């Protein structure tokens, strides 16, 4: 994923917040996102890839909220962003050649790189017609 990101946006700065989330633990990923996103400057692009539903019918999203942009699966991981915020979301289109098992590399990383290069959110896909999935979740303090 990092190679794809840097190939698409060579000037990007990449920061790994954590690698301590158990595979598929969406609730922990949402918690960490809720505790960290606001510590970054406005305009930051956050790529979240905790995705046990890869290859399923779950949507792939890019969204804008709180002056930040976020890319990842519509599996509830964005729950902490959805409270008290105006959210603009687009559904990323799965192109030919995208692996059914590695959307992080083939779908989410190219979208994040496009945003880092100044592409508007709307260039990444159609407006998301649904409501991003929410977990039963208490926001962190």
Regions found by a protein language model. Name each.
Residues 11-13, 20-31, 35, 39-106:
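Active-site histidine-anchored catalytic micro-motif
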Residues 99-141:
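Anionic-ligand-binding alpha/beta catalytic cores of soluble enzymes and soluble regulatory domains
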Residues 7, 11, 39, 114-121:
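A structural signal for alpha-helix termini and helix-coil/disorder junctions
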Residues 2, 6, 30-34, 78-79, ...:
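Predominant activation on well-ordered alpha-helical scaffold segments within soluble catalytic domains
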Residues 1-15:
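N-terminal glycine-rich anion-binding loops that anchor highly charged ligand groups
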């Amino acid at each position: 994923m990092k190679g794809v990101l840097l190939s698409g946006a060579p000037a990007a700065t990449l920061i790994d917040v954590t690698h301590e989330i158990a595979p598929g633990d969406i609730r922990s990923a949402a918690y960490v996102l809720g505790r960290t996103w606001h510590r970054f400057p406005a305009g930051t692009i956050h790529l979240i890839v905790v995705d046990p539903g890869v290859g399923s019918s779950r949507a792939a999203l890019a969204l804008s909220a709180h002056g930040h942009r976020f890319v990842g699966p519509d599996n509830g991981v964005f729950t902490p962003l959805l409270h008290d915020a105006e959210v603009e979301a687009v559904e990323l289109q799965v192109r030919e050649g995208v692996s059914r098992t590695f959307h992080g590399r083939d779908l989410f990383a190219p979208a994040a790189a496009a945003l880092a290069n100044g592409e508007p959110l709307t260039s990444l896909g159609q407006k998301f017609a649904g409501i991003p999935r929410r977990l039963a979740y208490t926001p962190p303090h």
